[in-house]
């Protein structure tokens, strides 16, 4: 990944974390990594443990950011989520997979933020 893309991704994750805190999520962990993949943000929303993929883009030239969360990516997130839940012994919790789209624009410094709850299931 190019440095510019990493910077956009990191900025998007910072914005997403702040947004989630504002709407009542509790952020439990960021950038959870294991042998099968990575989860950008793990949070708690009510009774749910949420595994959140953050997708950041400048504009929609290549479609909506959430469209890049394809089946292979979903499967990696799912496998990483299972490992996280086993390690933390979170068997009794409900869980779901959310996606946050962050779209930066050239007109102002205010990005568009869209949270898609229960964005996919495996």
UniProtKB/Swiss-Prot annotation:
Cross-referenced InterPro entries: Restrct_endonuc-II-like (IPR011335), tRNA_endonuc-like_dom_sf (IPR011856), UPF0102_YraN-like (IPR003509)
Family according to the record: Belongs to the UPF0102 family.
Domain of life: Bacteria
Name of this protein: UPF0102 protein CKL_1410
Pfam families tied to this protein: UPF0102
MF terms (GO), sorted A to Z: nucleic acid binding
Signal peptide, first to last residue: none
Native source species: Clostridium kluyveri (strain ATCC 8527 / DSM 555 / NBRC 12016 / NCIMB 10680 / K1)
């Amino acid at each position: 990944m190019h440095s510019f893309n990493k910077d956009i991704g990191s900025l998007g994750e910072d914005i997403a974390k702040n947004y989630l805190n504002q709407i009542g999520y509790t952020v439990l962990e960021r950038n959870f990594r294991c042998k099968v993949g990575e989860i950008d943000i793990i949070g708690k929303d009510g009774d749910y443990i949420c595994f959140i993929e953050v997708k950041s883009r400048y504009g929609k030239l290549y479609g909506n950011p959430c469209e890049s969360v394809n089946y292979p990516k979903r499967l990696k997130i799912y496998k990483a989520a299972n490992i996280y839940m086993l390690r933390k012994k979170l068997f009794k919790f409900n869980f779901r997979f959310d996606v946050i789209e962050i779209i930066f624009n050239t007109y102002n410094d205010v990005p568009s933020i869209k949270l898609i709850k229960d964005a996919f299931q495996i």
